[in-house]
């Protein structure tokens, strides 16, 4: 069964509505870590424990960086299998950015503090 898709225009309308969907960032590790932006309000989930925390009473839109939506379709299909109302964003974040739609700055990855004495010359 194919995963339902949502266009960037429809998602923008939904984000501007009173009940926006939950946005899930499903980009693979490299594209995610080498990007400075994300869709407004997007959350990153890793693993089943994280998906269990998603609200079941809201629609979920999953996106990735692949214009063919491979990762987002896989994640959306799994969420649907678990009983969520999920769709994949057509064209992923690339199409969203190409249309100059709003984004948020992504938090920089957390880095461990240097070991004591590591900065001594």
What do the predicted segments below correspond to?
Residues 1-17, 21-22, 29-62, 66-121:
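Rhodanese-like catalytic fold shared by cysteine-dependent sulfurtransferases
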